[in-house]
Amino acid sequence: MIRRLSRAERLAAGRRAARRRINTEDRAWSTHSSDKPDIGLRLMAVLRDLHRGLPGRTALRALSIGSSSEPQLPILQAACRGGVTLLDIDTAARAQVRAAVAEQQLARATAGPRHGPVRTVVADMGAVLADPRAAAALRHAHLEGQRQHLVTFHHSLYYLPRAAWDAVVAATYHELLAPGAAIHAVLMSASATGPTTTTALYARWAGACFGARNDQDLAAFGRALRRRRALPGADVRIATSTVYFDHDDFGTFMGVVWMILLHPQVHRFSPRQQDAVTEWVYRHLWSRGEPLTQRQDHLIVTRTRR
């Protein structure tokens, strides 16, 4: 499949996309890639394990951290009669969730008694999970003092430096997880090398323009947790999957590219750099009908019952 735009059209589309809010690109990614079904399948497996391991009448409680509009909200709410809390620094994402909840009447459980309420919290996950004391304060201030049965980091650890992961995961594990509960994290694999992969795209452009090196290796982090036994009583599992993204609209395609390149939250590409990225993506991917390929790692940390 060959797609064509004039140079002026494609550069204008690339610059427009670079100005959009990240939650817009997040919606495009979750709607038009196979990421949502991939995470959904893994998430349902985690939930099944939780139901098997916990007492039968347990009303599960879940906390989704930094995942913007949380495309897995219907799964979480159906499974968690004790409620779902969405924590994000993005106020636009919070408003989007509130609108969806109101429209679908999820918070009032009109779909049936098995559906729990949805709450939103605006906070910086790096601050509220910086250490056990901060995490305990979050639990008492926003989670009614209750520990959670599931905490998710779905593509949200991108926005924390790798050096912060150990403290954030440890604080979550010790202060937010109930016995028998689990953490489910998902992140782009740091080791994929194919030319159409999001990993290679990031290495090429964030590396060339900012000297960035992707040290956010979730699989290696999980292996280190398991090897060091850093979380007492933890069962650590790692899996890797492949997802694809494509869209006939070049502006939408470029919006997802900017999200992957962490523009402008982490790396602010200049207009000239934006044009260079746009031209490369047009020539090597979109005009040829090549989808973006993402290898992504899943980390599941379960706190054994004690």
List each language-model region with its residue ranges.
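Class I SAM-dependent methyltransferase SAM/SAH-binding core
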Residues: 61-134
